Amino acid sequence: MTREEMTKERVTMLEIGQATLQEREGVMALLRANHADNLGEAERRDGFVTTNMTPEQMTALIAEENGVTVARDGAGVAAFALAAPWGFWSQWPFFRNMIRILGNYRFGGVTLTEENSYQYGPVCVDRDYRGRGVFERVFAASLRTMEDRYPIMVTFVNQANPRSYAAHSRKAGMATPGTFDYNGSHYYLKIGRAHV
């Protein structure tokens, strides 16, 4: 069996669900391996994440917010998507900036607020699984965890990350109502309905 055939078989066997505390280290390892700070320029062209989290923050996201959706490959984590109310994200200056500008945007005729929207992302798919429908499966499962609580999801995409922009625009169907700058970087604001 070729590597390609083995990967296809592994993709069909992925289990999608909410992360447990035992999977925290697998999520953290995938986050670190794909963080822009840990990638060369060529690797960043294939997508990257920019959010850093401590083990304690990840524990809270898993245990208190039920906000980590994973694709499991046996005992490992092949992909994840993070999602939580703005209150969780407000501990980061970047997200406090997003909260500050929410009211500048509307979606479906509604002005965005902390009460009617939540922050989705980052999402990360292991390189071996990219382009195989894993993003779509993890994205849909993540939406289901929040759809009863918030009608609107909001995220950001670094303008230097065209792979993420394409995934969120084409595969996730998210709109781009505007852009914003933070700390010398340029971002797209992405908005979508919080249901499958």
Mark where each language-model region is.
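Conserved N-terminal entry element of GNAT/NAT acetyltransferase domains
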Residues: M1-E25, A29, A33, D37-N38
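Conserved GNAT-fold acetyl-CoA-binding loop/helix
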Residues: H35-Q57
